[in-house]
C-alpha cells in the first residue's frame, strides 16, 4: 500500500481518526501523530481503509495522491486490477465486485451494516471516506452513533473523531511505527507497567474521547485509581498517563449520565470554584430579550455537581440555549493541564429541564435568529456579583459580596468575567466599565467601523488554549491580570 510513498498532499481540510484494535493501524498522520488522517484494518479475510476527507477518492489529479489511492485499492481488494463498485443501502452488486467505495452521505440500515461486516469478513474490501467535522457541522448529529461509517468501523477498532488535521508543511506523512500510534497497544503497556510514549499516550486519550467502546477498556485500567483532577498546584503533564486517562474518561462519561447522578469533578472546588453548602441556593425569575446578541449574563452561578432547574413560564424556548461556564477554551492539545481541559456546557432549552455539570460556572442564556422573548424561573443557583452599567438600581456594595466565586462587570460594549476576589473591594465598578467601553469605541473609531451591537467579552482563565491572550468570543487571558495588587 505504501510502496514508494512517504507523504501525500493536503487536500481540503481533513479530519482526524482513532485506532485501537490489534488488526487496525494508522496509515497517514499530520502534525499530531496520535490522531491519524487515514487508517486501515484487516477483518477476517477482508480489509477496510478509511480516510478523513472525500477529496482523496473523488477523481484525484495529484500524481502522488493518485498513486497512493491506487495502491490502497489494490491492498484493500487484494487484487492487481480490482472490480470497483459504489456502496448503497442494499447488497445488489456485492457479488460482482472486489471493492466497495463508501461516501459519507450513504447511511446504511443496521441490517445492511451487519451484512457488510460479514461480506468484509469473507474477503471483501471497502474504502470509506468522510470529512467528519464537516459532517457534524452540516447535520448537527452525533458522530459516533449517527454516522453509519463510524458504527461499522467501531467493530474494526477505529473511528473518525471531530478534530481538524494539520499537515507537516503542505503534506501528510506516512504513520510512524504502529505500536506507537495504536491506542490499544499503548493501553496494554500502561496497564502492564504504567508507562507509555508521548505518541501512544495521546493516541489512548484521543481514542477514549472518540469511542465509548474503547473508553470502557480505559476504565478497566484506571477505574480503581483515586485521582485528583488537574489544578495549578497539581498539574497533569503529558507524562502523567494515568491521570490524563482518568481526566479524559471522566470528561466523556459524565455527559451520558442522568442529571441526578452527575457529581462534582475532583479539583472543581479550586477552579472554577464552589460555594459552601450552607449558603442558600436561590430561585430567580428572568425575562429574556431575544434581540440581545451573544451570551446574556444572569448574575447566577451553578456550583459543581449541583442541579439547576429551568421552567419557562411564558414564550417559546425553541432557539434558546443555556450555557454553564464562561471558560470556553479546551485544553486537550496542551502538554500540561492546570485545570480540567473542558469545563463548559451548552444545552438547547425546553419548557422545563434540569442541568448539572461536574464543574458548574456562571449561567448564561443565548438567543438565535429564530427565537422569541421568553420568561422563566431558574432555581438551584447562587448569586454572583454582577455590575451592569445600564441598571441604575444595583446596590453595588451589597452586590459585590454575593457568594459565587466569579463576577462580571458589564458595560455597553465590553463585559469582564473575573474572580469575585477581584471585585470584593472594588468601590467604583462604573469607572471600570466606562474605561473598557472607551477602549472598544476608540478601537472602532480608529478602524473606521461601527461599534458592534454585541458587546465584546473578556474572560480571565486559569489556563487558555493558546498564548498569553487570544482573540475570539470571548477574548481570553490569564487569571493573573485580574488578581488585585497589594
Residue ranges of predicted features:
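Solvent-exposed loop/turn segments at secondary-structure junctions
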Residues: 33, 54-58, 105-108, 132-136, ...
Amino acid at each position: 500500500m505504501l510502496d514508494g510513498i512517504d507523504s501525500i498532499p493536503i487536500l481540503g481540510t481533513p479530519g482526524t481518526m482513532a485506532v485501537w484494535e490489534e488488526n487496525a493501524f494508522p496509515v497517514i498522520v499530520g502534525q499530531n501523530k496520535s490522531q491519524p488522517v487515514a487508517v486501515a484494518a484487516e477483518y477476517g479475510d477482508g480489509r477496510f481503509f478509511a480516510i478523513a476527507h472525500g477529496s482523496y477518492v473523488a477523481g484525484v489529479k495529484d500524481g502522488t495522491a493518485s498513486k497512493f489511492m491506487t495502491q490502497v485499492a489494490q491492498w484493500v481488494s487484494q487484487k492487481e486490477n480490482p472490480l470497483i463498485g459504489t456502496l448503497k443501502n442494499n447488497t445488489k452488486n456485492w457479488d460482482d465486485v472486489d471493492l466497495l467505495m463508501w461516501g459519507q452521505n450513504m447511511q446504511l440500515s443496521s441490517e445492511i451494516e451487519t451484512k457488510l461486516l460479514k461480506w468484509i469478513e469473507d474477503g471483501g474490501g471497502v474504502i470509506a471516506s468522510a470529512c467528519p467535522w464537516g459532517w457534524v457541522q452540516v447535520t448537527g448529529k452525533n458522530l459516533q452513533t449517527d454516522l453509519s461509517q463510524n458504527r461499522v468501523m467501531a467493530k474494526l477498532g477505529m473511528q473518525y473523531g471531530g478534530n481538524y488535521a494539520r499537515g507537516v508543511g503542505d503534506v501528510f506523512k506516512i504513520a510512524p511505527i504502529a505500536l506507537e500510534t495504536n491506542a490499544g497497544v499503548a493501553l496494554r503497556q500502561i496497564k502492564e507497567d504504567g508507562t507509555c510514549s508521548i505518541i501512544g499516550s495521546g493516541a489512548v486519550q484521543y481514542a477514549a474521547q472518540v469511542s465509548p467502546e474503547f473508553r470502557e477498556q480505559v476504565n478497566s485500567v484506571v477505574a480503581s485509581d483515586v485521582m485528583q483532577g488537574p489544578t495549578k498546584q497539581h498539574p497533569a503533564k503529558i507524562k502523567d498517563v494515568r491521570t490524563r486517562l482518568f481526566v479524559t474518561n471522566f470528561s466523556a462519561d459524565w455527559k451520558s449520565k442522568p442529571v441526578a447522578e452527575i457529581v462534582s469533578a475532583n479539583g472543581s472546588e479550586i477552579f472554577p470554584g464552589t460555594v459552601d453548602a450552607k449558603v442558600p441556593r436561590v430561585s430567580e425569575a428572568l425575562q429574556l430579550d431575544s434581540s440581545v446578541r451573544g451570551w446574556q449574563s444572569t448574575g447566577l452561578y451553578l456550583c459543581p455537581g449541583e442541579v439547576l432547574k429551568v421552567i419557562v413560564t411564558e414564550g417559546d424556548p425553541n432557539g434558546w440555549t443555556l450555557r454553564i461556564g464562561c471558560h470556553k477554551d479546551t485544553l486537550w492539545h496542551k502538554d500540561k493541564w492546570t485545570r480540567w481541559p473542558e469545563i463548559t456546557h451548552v444545552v438547547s432549552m425546553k419548557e422545563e429541564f434540569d442541568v448539572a455539570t461536574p464543574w458548574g460556572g456562571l449561567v448564561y442564556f443565548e438567543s438565535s435568529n429564530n427565537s422569541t422573548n421568553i420568561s422563566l424561573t431558574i432555581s438551584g443557583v447562587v448569586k454572583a456579583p454582577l455590575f451592569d452599567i445600564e441598571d441604575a438600581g444595583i446596590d453595588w456594595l451589597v452586590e459585590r459580596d454575593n457568594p459565587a466565586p466569579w463576577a462580571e462587570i458589564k458595560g455597553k460594549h465590553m463585559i469582564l468575567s473575573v474572580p469575585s476576589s477581584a471585585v470584593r473591594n472594588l468601590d467604583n465598578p462604573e469607572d471600570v466599565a466606562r474605561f473598557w467601553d472607551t477602549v472598544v469605541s476608540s478601537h472602532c473609531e480608529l478602524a473606521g467601523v461601527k461599534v458592534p451591537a454585541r458587546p465584546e467579552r473578556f474572560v480571565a482563565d486559569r489556563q487558555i488554549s493558546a498564548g498569553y491572550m487570544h482573540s475570539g468570543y470571548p477574548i481570553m487571558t490569564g487569571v493573573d491580570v485580574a488578581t488585585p495588587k497589594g
